[in-house]
Amino acid sequence: MKLVCRQNELNTSLSLVSRAVPSRPNHPVLANVLLAADAGTQRLSLTAFDLSLGIQTSFAAQVERSGAITLPAKLLNDIVSRLPNDSDVTLEDNDAAATLSVGSGQYQMRGISADEFPELPLVQSQEALQLSASALIEGLRGTLFATSGDETKQILTGVHLKVQPDGLEFAATDGHRLAVVKTENAAATPATEFAVTVPSRALRDLERMIAIRGSDEAIALYHDQGQTVFQWGDQYLTSRTLDGQYPNYGQLIPREFNRNVAVDRKRLLAALERIAVLADQQNNAIRLSLDPENNRLALAVDAQDVGSGQEAVPAEIIGEPLEIAFNVRYLAEGLKALNTTDIQIQLNSNTSPVVLSPLGPVKITYLVMPIQLRS
C-alpha cells in the first residue's frame, strides 16, 4: 500500500472512526484502525469496530498501490493530529509496519495484519429503508438528550425508532421525562412497518458523521434481528440493537388538559438559566407559578444556606392558578430541544405529567414529571 492524502481529511476520518475503538479491547487488533487503500477508486477507507459498534468512512486520496493494514488507533491519531494542517501525508506499508511521512518528518509504526481485523456485520434483509438526512437529524436532536445514562435500565439508554407509512417516530425516556418526535420521511415510504431501539452512543456518532460527511442523498437503513446499519455513499455505521420491550410511552401522554400556557421559548429559557444558578444542588428544584390574572409565569428558587431568586415571564394562560415544581435541568433541556419561537405548556395538576410542545408545524412532544417539594 502506498498513498498520499491531505492531513485534514485523514485527521477528520480518524476522529470519526476512533469512537468505535474500545478502551479495553479483548483482542489486540480491536485497538487498531483498519486502513484500506484502493487504486481503482482512488480512495482510502478507515474502519474501527468494538464488536458492538462499527464505523467506516472513506475519502479521496492519491493511491499508488492498493493494500490494507491495521495501525494503533490512539498512536496514529496522536501523530496525525499534530501534523501541519492541510499538509500532504504519505503513507506506505511494509509487511506489518507502516511509514508515515510529511515534509521532513517520518514516523514508523508497528501494525497488525488486516486479515486479523473482524469484518463488519452484514444485515441479511435485502430491502433498505431510505431516510432523508434532515428527518433523521431532526429526530435525533429532539430525543437523544432524554435517554437514560443508567446502564441498569439498558433499554432506556437508546432511542426507539418506529418506522410508519406516514413517516418516522423517535422516542426516548429515562423514566423522569419523555421526548417524542414525529418527522415526515421525504425519501421513501417503507414497505413494512417496524420498530427498533438503537443505543444512544451509536446514534450520537451517526449524528456526528452526518454533520461532517453528510450529503443530500438518502441514508439507507438496514435492519435485521439484533443489528442495524446506516449507510450513505461509502459511509457506514453498524450497531447492535438493544434487547427488550420498549415502554408503551403513548399511554403516558395525557389526552386532555385543564391548563394551557403559551410563552416565548427563548425568554423562558433565559430566565430559567439565570435563576438555575441558585437552584438547590440536592434536587435542582425550581417552582413555577401560573398567574393568569397578570398573564405571567413566575419562577422561583429557594436554596437553603445559599439564597433565593425570582423571575417573571409574560405568558398567555388559560385555566386556574397553580404552583408546580420541576427539576431545572429537565425543564431547560426540553426547552432547548423544542427549538421554535413560541411553545405551549399543557398541564392538569402539580402531580401529573406536564407536556411541552412547539406552537407551529414541528411535531415534538416533551413530557416531564413534576417533583414534590416539602412546604
UniProtKB/Swiss-Prot annotation:
InterPro entries: DNA_clamp_sf, DNA_polIII_beta, DNA_polIII_beta_C, DNA_polIII_beta_cen, DNA_polIII_beta_N
Molecular-function GO term, any one: DNA binding
Gene3D superfamilies the record matches: 3.70.10.10, DNA Polymerase III, subunit A, domain 2
Xref: CDD domains: beta_clamp
Alphabetized UniProt keyword annotations: Cytoplasm, DNA replication, DNA-binding, DNA-directed DNA polymerase, Nucleotidyltransferase, Transferase
GO cellular component: cytoplasm; DNA polymerase III complex
Entry's localization field: Cytoplasm
Entry superkingdom: Bacteria
UniProt key word Nucleotidyltransferase: yes
Cited SUPFAM superfamilies: DNA clamp (SSF55979)
Statement: the UniProt record of this protein carries the keyword Nucleotidyltransferase: yes
Cross-referenced Pfam families: DNA_pol3_beta, DNA_pol3_beta_2, DNA_pol3_beta_3
Family: Belongs to the beta sliding clamp family.
Self-association state and partner proteins as the record states: Forms a ring-shaped head-to-tail homodimer around DNA which binds and tethers DNA polymerases and other proteins to the DNA. The DNA replisome complex has a single clamp-loading complex (3 tau and 1 each of delta, delta', psi and chi subunits) which binds 3 Pol III cores (1 core on the leading strand and 2 on the lagging strand) each with a beta sliding clamp dimer. Additional proteins in the replisome are other copies of gamma, psi and chi, Ssb, DNA helicase and RNA primase.
NCBIfam families in UniProt: dnan (TIGR00663)
Task of the protein: Confers DNA tethering and processivity to DNA polymerases and other proteins. Acts as a clamp, forming a ring around DNA (a reaction catalyzed by the clamp-loading complex) which diffuses in an ATP-independent manner freely and bidirectionally along dsDNA. Initially characterized for its ability to contact the catalytic subunit of DNA polymerase III (Pol III), a complex, multichain enzyme responsible for most of the replicative synthesis in bacteria; Pol III exhibits 3'-5' exonuclease proofreading activity.
Protein name: Beta sliding clamp
Origin species: Synechococcus elongatus (strain ATCC 33912 / PCC 7942 / FACHB-805) (Anacystis nidulans R2)
Gene expressing this chain: dnaN
